[in-house]
Amino acid sequence: MGSTRVRIAIDAMGGDHAPGEIVAGALRAKEELGVEILLVGDPQQIEAALPPKTNLAQVEIVPAEEAIAMDEEPLNAVRRKRKASINVAMDLVKQQKADAVFSAGHSGAAMASALLRLGRLPGIDRPAIGTVFPTIVAGKPVLVLDVGANVDCRPKFLEQFAVMGSAYSQYVLGTTEPKVGLLNIGEEDSKGNDAAVRAHQLLRENSQINFIGNAEGRDVLSGHFDVIVCDGFVGNVLLKFAEAVGEVILQILREELPQGLHGQIGSAFLKPNLKRVKQRMDHAEHGGALLLGVAGVCFIGHGSSQAPSIFNAIRMAKEAVDNQVLQRIQSQYILERESG
């Protein structure tokens, strides 16, 4: 691509706060991370969102004629709006003009666009959306996948999620021999429905992963597992519930801080602790979820993402590119086929 710096295509029109917050987070990433940013979307809106006195010669804008709204049916919209910002961003990766893509827009549209334009990695039947959850062990997150790409999953898909998740956990999150669990209703091997039992057997027999058994709901945030696999229906419910619980806990802490003069003094001492709690629980700290299994680095952000989330998502995308996550996943499947 003519440059050693990581180039990231940003869907500047995707998200509740686009393009303003998207542009702000992207410019911060350009300055602090040394990445090259390609802002994809309506040039007039993007330029209007730039800070005053911005040197336009230093900002690369890739025009896109349309955007996909959150209420549109994703597959039809992606096919109908060929020049939509998410499609143009994906094309930049396909044409090797960008190393990764990020969008805080319609997650279904991002997945559909990635599949249609980039395709799947060899050996992967279904892509999965993987997101990072905090745990009770500081600095030890858990990667949960799938959290929304596949409502129904065959046991083989869950095995593939485990392989991909292990590669991401090891090479991006820095986990040594990631411990993999299967989300289930009990610890015993025989627990769960037929699909869960068969998935358990496949995971147990796969020598490419460090499968340590079933994970119950109470285990997800325990820090005992590094990767947890489940179907996208359960995973999405888990994700939305965890986000809601985090917001409730933070609100309760704010309401229960002591009142009055003594309370104000106490609150002054507690504020740094509250800030650290928020940082550990806030999804903005991780920025986005990686769409694993497609032939390109693709991060999907929360629709409500603001500049800090955008920055962190770009940081994670850069780490995924730098650590060659796609190549690592492919090599795992080559080894598996050879050993099989």
Curated annotation (Swiss-Prot):
Query: Any keyword Coiled coil?
Result: no
> What are the protein's UniProt keywords?
Cytoplasm, Lipid biosynthesis, Lipid metabolism, Phospholipid biosynthesis, Phospholipid metabolism, Transferase
Molecular function (Gene Ontology), one example: phosphate:acyl-[acyl carrier protein] acyltransferase activity
Please state what class of enzyme this protein is.
transferase
Q: Which reaction does it catalyse?
A: a fatty acyl-[ACP] + phosphate = an acyl phosphate + holo-[ACP]
Q: What is its main location?
A: cytoplasm
Metabolic or biological pathway, per its Swiss-Prot or TrEMBL entry: Lipid metabolism; phospholipid metabolism
Q: Look up keyword Lipid metabolism and say if it applies.
A: yes
**Cellular localisation:** Cytoplasm
Give start-end ranges for the coiled-coil region(s): none
Q: Which InterPro entries match?
A: FA_synthesis, Phospholipid_synth_PlsX-like
User: How does this protein assemble?
Assistant: Homodimer. Probably interacts with PlsY.
What role does it play? Catalyzes the reversible formation of acyl-phosphate (acyl-PO(4)) from acyl-[acyl-carrier-protein] (acyl-ACP). This enzyme utilizes acyl-ACP as fatty acyl donor, but not acyl-CoA.
Q: Which family does it belong to?
A: Belongs to the PlsX family.
Q: Which PANTHER family match?
A: FATTY ACID/PHOSPHOLIPID SYNTHESIS PROTEIN PLSX, PHOSPHATE ACYLTRANSFERASE
Recorded protein name is Phosphate acyltransferase
Q: What is the lineage of its organism?
A: Bacteria, Bacillati, Cyanobacteriota, Cyanophyceae, Nostocales
